[in-house]
Swiss-Prot record:
Biological process per Gene Ontology, one example term: translation
Gene: RPS27AA
PANTHER family: UBIQUITIN
InterPro entries listed in its UniProt record: Ribosomal_eS31, Ribosomal_eS31_euk-type_sf, Ribosomal_zn-bd, Ubiquitin-like_dom, Ubiquitin-like_domsf, Ubiquitin_CS, Ubiquitin_dom, Ubiquitin_ubiquitin-like
Alphabetical keyword list: Cytoplasm, Isopeptide bond, Metal-binding, Nucleus, Ribonucleoprotein, Ribosomal protein, Zinc, Zinc-finger
Protein name as it appears in the record: Ubiquitin-ribosomal protein eS31z fusion protein
Top-rank lineage group of the source organism: Eukaryota
UniProt family annotation: In the N-terminal section; belongs to the ubiquitin family.
Domain called Ubiquitin-like: residue spans: 1-76
Record-level Gene Ontology MF annotations: mRNA binding; structural constituent of ribosome; zinc ion binding
Pfam family, one: Ribosomal_S27
Amino acid sequence: MQIFVKTLTGKTITLEVESSDTIDNVKAKIQDKEGIPPDQQRLIFAGKQLEDGRTLADYNIQKESTLHLVLRLRGGAKKRKKKTYTKPKKIKHTHKKVKLAVLQFYKVDGSGKVQRLKKECPSVSCGPGTFMASHFDRHYCGKCGTTYVFKKADEE
């Protein structure tokens, strides 16, 4: 019987085969006509890839049936090189969460009176709730730059 083999280029090859022929025999005949080695050939019929050991009758391939020839691709994607960094990785700053951080701004004395530990900035541009930093010799506002310097007892 006669079957057709359609290649990727669109070229159609006619082969003279028997229904008892194996897929290996068909691939060998394609190699004789086209020069494509059998290990690179994939034959597809009715959406299924044909296995080498089976016969044409196993797949119900009759006279004047068309098989599609596809080339087998070996391997996968190219392996990527691992990146090498010239500088060591920068350590990111992590915010330290302090529970009840507001308590460091106030002190409660024995009688229950609340006393403010840090001075609040009197500047209009800062607004209420902006505290000044306490240094050993001054109070400093980081927002507006206002500075109050302490007088030493021996300077008076």
